[in-house]
Amino acid sequence: MSKITSSTLRTFKQEGKKFTALTAYDASFASAFDSEGIDVLLVGDSMGMVLQGHSDTLPVTVDDIAYHTRCVRRGIEHSLLIADMPFMSYATPEQTMVNATTLMQAGASMVKVEGGHWLLESVAMLTERGIPVCAHLGLTPQSVHVFGGFKVQGRDADNAQRILDEAKALEAAGAQLLVVECIPASLAKAITQALTIPVIGIGAGKDTDGQILVMHDVLGISSGYIPRFSKNYLKQTGEIRAAVRAYIDEVAQGVFPGDEHTFN
């Protein structure tokens, strides 16, 4: 199994090969996911909810992400490792550079930021200085209070066009990957077709180049609200590694996400 890079994912896109991503926060789970063939691992600020017990992702700090990035890095050999930049850690280009450097030194191969046009300067700056960027559009959880909750984005024509325009602009600024979350499947398809960089979906239909889920949802250990776009693979397989393989297989075959996991 060869090491996954952003170039690998571009090749997958060109060949029409679907790829998979999961969140990970420690060496043991990361090692299991890596060895079973998960292409991308994200040290997500979702840890604020699934690990720390908060109601949203806002309390997560750069130190939190850096610590868990170091843990995950020690457990993997092949997967591309992305680290989330948490709330208010990239409000200015200067702040972005300092905090992104911290996460790269902790072992990340790429950093992820949430937002559109206001991030273009920072994305270009990071890229020019050797820090790869994954952008994130649609439902951006750090903006949950602006949205008035965890709501599907891009359902009306104006917002759909805005998200598409932002996706193109972020690619032009140098973003190497894009995550789209909780947007209509038709919009996700249009974005995927419009960009040359790989697009990873979560709650965005089956036409994106890859899929990502939170590991706690895949393993059925999330408490409280269970997102519509998630699927408990452990329930159908009974074993963690088998659950991961089932997720990989269903994405590759176009079975997941199904209509029941998709927004229109």
UniProtKB/Swiss-Prot annotation:
GO cellular component annotations of the record: cytoplasm
Residues annotated to bind 3-methyl-2-oxobutanoate: 45-46, 84, 112
Cofactor (UniProt): Mg(2+)
GO MF annotation, one: magnesium ion binding
SUPFAM superfamilies in UniProt: Phosphoenolpyruvate/pyruvate domain (SSF51621)
Active-site positions on this chain: 181 (proton acceptor)
Localization in the cell: Cytoplasm
Pathway: Cofactor biosynthesis; (R)-pantothenate biosynthesis; (R)-pantoate from 3-methyl-2-oxobutanoate: step 1/2
Gene Ontology annotations of biological process type: pantothenate biosynthetic process
Positions annotated to bind Mg(2+): 45, 84, 114
Family: Belongs to the PanB family.
Subunit structure: Homodecamer; pentamer of dimers.
Function of the protein: Catalyzes the reversible reaction in which hydroxymethyl group from 5,10-methylenetetrahydrofolate is transferred onto alpha-ketoisovalerate to form ketopantoate.
HAMAP family assigned: PanB
Protein name in the entry: 3-methyl-2-oxobutanoate hydroxymethyltransferase
